[in-house]
């Protein structure tokens, strides 16, 4: 608590506290319970009604039923032994099972996180405050939007809401995993509270902002469980390509008997089924859903809640990131560093009016002005009775201050805004005002002009600090081909100094909320995808306009509703990690698609020569792998085709290693590793399986 002396009386002002990000809560990929449940779900997903959602694996399951029939009724298959049909049937079953297991494992990790969130969702009693002041206790599940609720120290906040009265410390660890409490108070951008969190000091009155079942925690549980997950546009497009390839191979395999009959020999149905399954892209088909689910899970592990997979994918395609200066690029704790009187005014006069404009200002800047004035020993003699109405800062006016009961008005704020305010009252502007303001700006500070009536008394020098490592992070984004833009309400000189120090590509000075929307639209008109962060109600329109809008959990309900991602740690710089995760998701999908198609090329060289060697002896020259026999070649390729899916599950879950580099370098690297590797690995794998299979085939 800090005392502010006003003519011998004390006004207590609570100091704010800033928490650091908590450790990320996550479920291990191979947790025993998750794996056990994934096995059960993989079996349940064998239901054709479930399998039809994945057309590629549905084709494999149809093949399983065909070979199962051939195994049960051997007379339908006369060209191959019964053991071959049974083996093919089992391998196809495991192929489908492994694909289902990958998806169930990814979903299981989300469900484990959802279970921990459900533990925070308890039906407690709430103290409803009626219009006449009477307090009634009801179950939290009976609260409706608009209800006023009193929450005291030690009580759980019964539902989502906004603080309308009071100030308190709130423990949000049940939601964010961060143990340090955060301050919540009426007004401003930090009035939003979440149901399931607990008040640890003082008391607050909140207005409920959601009906039962519509709270933030309810939405989190649904999203983390994947109940609302839909396929993203990129996923749908890739699925369309894979289905097209499957249809092409299906037509080729169905018409193949016409060709073999012409050559004078017949191919058994089970061999045709095995050939089809080996040629269609089953690897990526079996892992595609798991990759998408795991991508959202990786975002969740960073304590970021993505409203859809589309938002995560969009983050991977981002071209421009728009960042607020305060709290994102800089620490955001601009503190009063000096007082500079202008014209013929004295520093004592400036100190008096600076303090008067800040005595009821609960912002960090306002409190720092009071601290500075008191630390320098300045005094002012204003009775508490003379203090009138506080004028809060607004983005439109860019000023705050107080209207005294005597009729005098005092303001502090952006130099340009205060000049306009003074000139509107026919006041004169000191000749050295701009010179001193420019001096502060060139040093990277922020000048706030102080005026009373139609006189400007001087400047408050606010100083902020760029967060360490920001220049390096922006350089990484530049290597990824992403442009960074800084938006700030500071004047152009201050903005330019901070931008140069931080290493951002462009900046927008004296930026108002509507300016952010204009900047976003301008970038989008150039065909670029834009990401931005925000926490205030005035950020909501821009968050909605951006392709990726990351809202802070500590921000207002309007900001969180407008955004498509919410950072539970309220760390604006996390947008950079979100972009990296999005790119990793797209790269993982692309790399495994490349690997899957390259696999098909290798399997082609394993199966086709073996199938036609009997009828066309010259095909033996293409049997470069030296496989044991035609049946061994087909089984080896089919077994490898099944085993590669579980072998790639950890990579699909974790994502491929990502380092910032140019698109061309990235493409060459992935083609080399996953294209060439996708051809080489099957040659080695199929040969090893053939050596084992050959031991059982005479």
Swiss-Prot record:
Membrane topology classification: Multi-pass membrane protein
Protein name: Potassium-transporting ATPase ATP-binding subunit
Keywords, comma-separated and alphabetical: ATP-binding, Cell membrane, Ion transport, Magnesium, Membrane, Metal-binding, Nucleotide-binding, Phosphoprotein, Potassium, Potassium transport, Translocase, Transmembrane, Transmembrane helix, Transport
Molecular-function annotations in GO: ATP binding; ATP hydrolysis activity; magnesium ion binding; P-type potassium transmembrane transporter activity
Organism of this sequence: Bacillus cytotoxicus (strain DSM 22905 / CIP 110041 / 391-98 / NVH 391-98)
Binding site for Mg(2+): 535, 539
One matching Pfam family: E1-E2_ATPase
Binding-site residues, ATP: 361, 365, 393-400, 412
Encoding gene (name): kdpB
Active site, renumbered: 324
Top-level taxon: Bacteria
Family under the similarity heading: Belongs to the cation transport ATPase (P-type) (TC 3.A.3) family. Type IA subfamily.
Localization terms from the record: Cell membrane
Catalytic activity: K(+)(out) + ATP + H2O = K(+)(in) + ADP + phosphate + H(+)
Major subcellular location class: membrane
Family annotation (PANTHER family): POTASSIUM-TRANSPORTING ATPASE ATP-BINDING SUBUNIT (PTHR43743:SF1)
E.C. code: 7.2.2.6
Residue intervals passing through the bilayer: 56-76, 82-102, 240-260, 271-291, 605-625, 633-653, 677-697
């Amino acid at each position: 608590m800090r005392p502010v002396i006003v003519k011998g009386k004390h006004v207590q002002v609570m100091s704010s506290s800033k928490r650091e990000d908590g450790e990320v809560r996550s479920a291990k990929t191979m947790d025993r319970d998750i794996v056990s449940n994934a096995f059960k779900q993989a079996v349940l997903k064998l239901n054709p009604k479930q399998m039809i959602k994945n057309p590629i694996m549905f084709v494999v399951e149809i093949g399983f039923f065909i070979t199962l029939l051939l195994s049960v009724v051997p007379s339908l298959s006369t060209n191959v032994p019964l053991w071959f049909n049974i083996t093919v049937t089992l391998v196809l079953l495991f192929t489908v099972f492994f694909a289902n297991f990958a998806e169930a494992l990814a979903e299981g990790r989300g469900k484990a996180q959802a279970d921990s969130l459900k533990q925070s969702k308890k039906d407690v009693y709430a103290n409803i405050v009626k219009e006449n002041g009477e307090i009634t206790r009801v179950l939290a599940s009976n609260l409706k939007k608009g209800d006023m609720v009193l929450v005291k120290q030690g009580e759980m906040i019964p539902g989502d809401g906004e603080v309308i009265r009071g100030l308190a410390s709130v423990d949000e660890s049940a939601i964010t995993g961060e143990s340090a409490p955060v301050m919540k108070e009426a007004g401003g951008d930090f009035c939003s509270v979440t149901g399931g969190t607990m008040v640890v000091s003082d008391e607050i009155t909140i207005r409920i902002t959601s009906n039962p079942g519509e709270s933030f925690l309810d939405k989190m549980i649904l999203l983390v469980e994947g109940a609302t997950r839909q396929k993203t546009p990129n996923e749908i497009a890739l699925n369309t390509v894979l289905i097209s390839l499957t249809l092409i191979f299906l037509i080729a395999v169905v018409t193949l008997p016409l060709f073999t009959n012409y050559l004078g020999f017949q191919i058994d149905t089970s061999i045709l089924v095995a050939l089809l399954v080996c040629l269609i892209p089953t690897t990526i088909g079996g892992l595609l859903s798991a990759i998408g689910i795991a991508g959202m899970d990786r975002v969740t592990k960073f304590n970021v809640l993505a409203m859809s997979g589309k938002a995560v994918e969009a983050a991977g395609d981002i071209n421009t990131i728009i960042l607020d200066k305060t709290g994102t690029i800089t620490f955001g704790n601009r503190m009063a560093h000096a007082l500079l009187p202008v014209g013929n005014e004295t520093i004592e006069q400036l100190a008096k009016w600076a303090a008067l404009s800040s005595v009821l200002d609960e912002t960090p800047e306002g409190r720092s002005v009071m601290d500075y004035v008191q630390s320098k020993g300045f005094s002012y003699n204003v009775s508490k009775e003379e203090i009138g109405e506080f004028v809060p800062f607004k983005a439109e006016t860019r000023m705050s201050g107080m209207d005294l009961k005597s009729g005098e008005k005092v303001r502090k704020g952006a130099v340009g805004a205060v000049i306009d305010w003074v000139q509107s009252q026919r006041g004169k502007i000191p000749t050295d005002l701009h010179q001193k303001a420019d001096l502060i700006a060139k040093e990277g500070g922020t000048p706030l002009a102080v005026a009373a009536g139609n006189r400007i008394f001087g400047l408050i020098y606010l100083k902020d600090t760029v967060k360490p490592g920001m220049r390096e992070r922006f350089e990484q984004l530049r290597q990824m081909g992403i442009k960074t833009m800084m938006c700030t309400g500071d004047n152009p000189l201050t903005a330019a100094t901070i931008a140069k120090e931080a290493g951002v590509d462009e900046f927008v000075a004296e930026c108002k909320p509507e300016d952010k929307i204009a900047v976003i639209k301008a970038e989008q008109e150039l065909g670029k995808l834009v990401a931005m962060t925000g926490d205030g109600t005035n950020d909501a329109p821009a968050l909605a306009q951006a392709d990726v809008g990351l809202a802070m959990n500590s921000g207002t309900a309007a900001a969180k509703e407008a955004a498509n991602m919410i950072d539970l740690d309220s760390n604006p710089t996390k947008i950079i990690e979100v972009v990296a995760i999005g790119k990793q998701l797209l790269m993982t999908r692309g790399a495994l698609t490349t690997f899957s198609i390259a696999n098909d090329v290798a399997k082609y060289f394993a199966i086709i020569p073996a199938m036609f060697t009997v009828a066309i002896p010259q095909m033996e020259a293409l049997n470069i792998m030296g496989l044991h026999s035609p049946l061994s070649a087909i089984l080896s390729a089919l077994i490898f085709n099944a085993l590669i899916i579980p072998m790639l599950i950890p990579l699909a879950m974790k994502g491929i290693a990502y380092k910032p580099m140019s698109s061309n370098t990235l493409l060459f690297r992935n083609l080399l590793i996953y294209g060439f590797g996708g051809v080489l690995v099957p040659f080695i794998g199929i040969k090893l399986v053939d050596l084992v299979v050959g031991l059982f085939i005479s």
